Amino acid sequence: MHIDTTRFGRVLIQESDLVRLPEGLVGFRSFTQFVLIPDPVMAGLSWLQSATAPELAFGLVAPPLALGDYRVELRPGDRAALELDDERSALIYVILNRAEGGLTVNLQGPLVFNPPRRLGRQMVLTSSRFAVRYPLDGPAILPGPTAFRATA
């Protein structure tokens, strides 16, 4: 199947490449079908591209390496929604934003994916410990996807 994108043109994907976010994203609840596309230029950057809206794509990176203590707590309802049997198989991404003064990531709204089930969910963290606009120091801080780390 093909999807049209404004960033990459027409992209050939397999149906199995689709990732469902049944609840959508904050501000974009009606969009639930996406595909993860690795950036062809910058390693560690991926795009969460809507399968139905060509103009809707979000840059995703793993939480910055500088935040070794970054934790996402999954409650039982989160695990059920993601059909997650083993939290170690989950991946965490954060949304990249361009702001005055450089790039930032949203640490309060991470995305958690269950790759085997092709399911994702945006979490909304209630702790004020992490910023909505956490500044990145540069492209060297863009690692690949992060394995899930649970907290009690």
Region locations from a protein language model:
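A short glycine-leucine-enriched loop at secondary-structure breakpoints
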Residues: 82-85
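Short beta-strand-centered segments at strand-helix junctions
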Residues: 70-77
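Long, compositionally biased stretches
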Residues: 1-68, 87-152
